[in-house]
Amino acid sequence: MIGGIGMPELIVILVIVLIIFGAGRLPELGAGLGKGIKNFRKATSELESAATGEKKPEELEEKK
């Protein structure tokens, strides 16, 4: 598969991560990665709404 990551590649990456960090730290890494993705999505949605001038329902209620 050109330009994509298939199942064999994902398995190899997972094995390498297990070797480097160990099974005990995987939950910590997963939680940190999840928080990072959540913050990234929140920041991008805030930037998009600021660029288009849209207001979120929470922002409209705060100004009342």
Curated annotation (Swiss-Prot):
Q: Which GO terms describe its molecular function?
A: protein transmembrane transporter activity
Topology in the lipid bilayer is annotated as: Single-pass membrane protein
**Where is the protein found, in the record's own terms?**
Cell inner membrane
Cellular compartments per GO CC: TAT protein transport complex
Q: Where are the transmembrane segments?
A: 1-21
Q: Which keywords are on file for this protein?
A: Cell inner membrane, Cell membrane, Membrane, Protein transport, Translocation, Transmembrane, Transmembrane helix, Transport
Q: What is its main location?
A: membrane
Which InterPro entries does the entry link to?
TatA/B/E (IPR003369), TatA/E (IPR006312)
Origin, by domain of life?
Bacteria
One GO BP: protein transport by the Tat complex
Q: Which Pfam families match?
A: TatA_B_E
Taken from the UniProt record, the cysteine pairs bridged by disulfide bonds within this chain are none
The family annotation for this protein states: Belongs to the TatA/E family.
Q: What is known about what this protein does?
A: Part of the twin-arginine translocation (Tat) system that transports large folded proteins containing a characteristic twin-arginine motif in their signal peptide across membranes. TatA could form the protein-conducting channel of the Tat system.
Q: Which HAMAP family match?
A: TatA_E
Quaternary structure, from the entry: The Tat system comprises two distinct complexes: a TatABC complex, containing multiple copies of TatA, TatB and TatC subunits, and a separate TatA complex, containing only TatA subunits. Substrates initially bind to the TatABC complex, which probably triggers association of the separate TatA complex to form the active translocon.
Record's protein name: Sec-independent protein translocase protein TatA
Origin species: Syntrophobacter fumaroxidans (strain DSM 10017 / MPOB)
Gene this chain is encoded by:
tatA
